[in-house]
């Protein structure tokens, strides 16, 4: 039943994608971030939903008469330079077959990100993109938070199988990166209940991070929380809320969770931690011997025999930094970090341009929350091989699109606001009864 439903949804979306290519970018984001096809039990698990959506979106973009503009901001230019560099390293990869397979996957992500930047034209398009990302990951945060509460935190969490976020650690990283985006959605929510819903999902997502039993997520969550407080408008209120809620959540967790977190102090006795250190040493050795790095898919047992400090202990990179270092060398790591630095500066530039204009308050909040999202990803990612995960690149796209539609190439926004039709009618009815003339008129019995 789920398989048929997903197929119907995908087919029904094609006319909308052909009419407005941005709808294709949003549909692609849903399938790449939420992975609904991985929650099915039949043909949908292997059906090429993503490929079909991507092809239709590309065709719609080429055929559409809408203006399509990719602003060559520092973030976009740096992304293109990084694409060139990782392609060059793939040519000289130590594991050619695996390298080109992974190169193909990464290039699809980069292409869709650039395509998304091109087809997002208006303020409502940016809001729709942000809302799509939040709903796609908020599903897992909402579900995981309720599961953690229902089980008292005794059972861990898992994401959709066969995806970037299939295990507890990678799922927790995605949740940490998405929480600030949920706060951003709350800043432009059209009604009070939608704002409360966004905050509620953010709280449940934070609970799911704690319930993931991920030690890297604990550190990433701490960094994200600190910057969330620093970027908040009311630091006193936000700080008081954090000081009240966080200790209660930690105290409510079972002893097994506490033991897991305390193992950070005894990393010398933790085989997993020592294996990660060995893989980091492997990445450094590869980068020292090969200026281009080892190319994609370098972390293999065979290549470990040559470059690892302890060739008998094989682990994957377990760090976005050492993953990029080992696969693309010191230059690749520099380009990767520079891209996120430019993204941070883009956020600061948006905040500065928005100033105190109340019309742009939501945009300033969104830019700040994207910065917090980057901090969460860069901190939690220090312990996970998630350098090519889609979500952080969508955060970069949101920042670029936000600057584009507000300051670089603003377009008249004729698209309807993000509001469900029946909710719009009810709101209009409430507003009508609030008017003096309506209040004075007698109601019909």
Go through each PLM region and give its residues:
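Hydrophobic transmembrane alpha-helices and their immediate junctions
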Residues: 237, 328-374, 398-399, 404
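A membrane-periplasm/extracellular boundary helix in multi-pass inner-membrane enzymes
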Residues: 145-151, 207-212, 229-271, 281-288, ...
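Membrane-interface helix caps and helix-loop-helix hairpins in membrane proteins
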Residues: 41-42, 92-101, 210-211, 383-386
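Membrane helix-loop boundary segments at the extracytoplasmic
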Residues: 30-40, 325-328, 361-403
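Membrane-interface micro-motifs in multi-pass membrane enzymes
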Residues: 1-3, 44-51, 101-102, 164-176, ...
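Alpha-helical transmembrane segments of multi-pass inner-membrane proteins
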Residues: 8-17, 57, 80-91, 108-115, ...
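Transmembrane signal-anchor hairpin modules in multi-pass inner-membrane enzymes, especially those
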Residues: 1-88, 97, 101, 121-131, ...
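Long extracytoplasmic/lumenal interhelical loops at the membrane interface
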Residues: 157-163, 265-328, 349-364, 369
